[in-house]
Amino acid sequence: MARYFRRRKFCRFTSEGVVEIDYKDIVTLKNYITESGKIVPSRITGTSARYQRQLARAIKRARYLSLLPYTDLHQ
């Protein structure tokens, strides 16, 4: 039987030494939301708990300021 090697997930923000996630950095935030607009959980992305909280806060702020959509485009 073939065994599949699961790659260990790592926190991108920890490795890059990010101090705080900015809500104005839309390019980064878009990588952490689904096509339907939901925030991707940390067990999928590998983000640490500290940065997951900052990420959620930044996404919610960006949504409130209409920088990011709450849902998909409904096309």
UniProtKB/Swiss-Prot annotation:
SUPFAM superfamilies tied to this protein: Ribosomal protein S18
The protein here is known as Small ribosomal subunit protein bS18
Query: What HAMAP family does this protein's entry cite?
Result: Ribosomal_bS18 (MF_00270)
Q: Which Pfam families match?
A: Ribosomal_S18 (PF01084)
Q: Which InterPro entries match?
A: Ribosomal_bS18, Ribosomal_bS18_CS, Ribosomal_bS18_sf
Q: Name one GO cellular component term.
A: cytosolic small ribosomal subunit
On subunit structure and binding partners, the annotation says: Part of the 30S ribosomal subunit. Forms a tight heterodimer with protein bS6.
Q: What is the lineage of its organism?
A: Bacteria, Pseudomonadati, Pseudomonadota, Gammaproteobacteria, Alteromonadales
Which Gene Ontology molecular-function terms are recorded? Answer: small ribosomal subunit rRNA binding; structural constituent of ribosome
Q: Which GO terms describe its biological process?
A: translation
Family (UniProt) = Belongs to the bacterial ribosomal protein bS18 family.
Q: Does the keyword Ribonucleoprotein apply?
A: yes
Q: Which organism is it from?
A: Shewanella frigidimarina (strain NCIMB 400)
Instruction: Provide this UniProt record's keywords sorted from A to Z.
Output: Ribonucleoprotein, Ribosomal protein, RNA-binding, rRNA-binding
Say what the protein does: Binds as a heterodimer with protein bS6 to the central domain of the 16S rRNA, where it helps stabilize the platform of the 30S subunit.
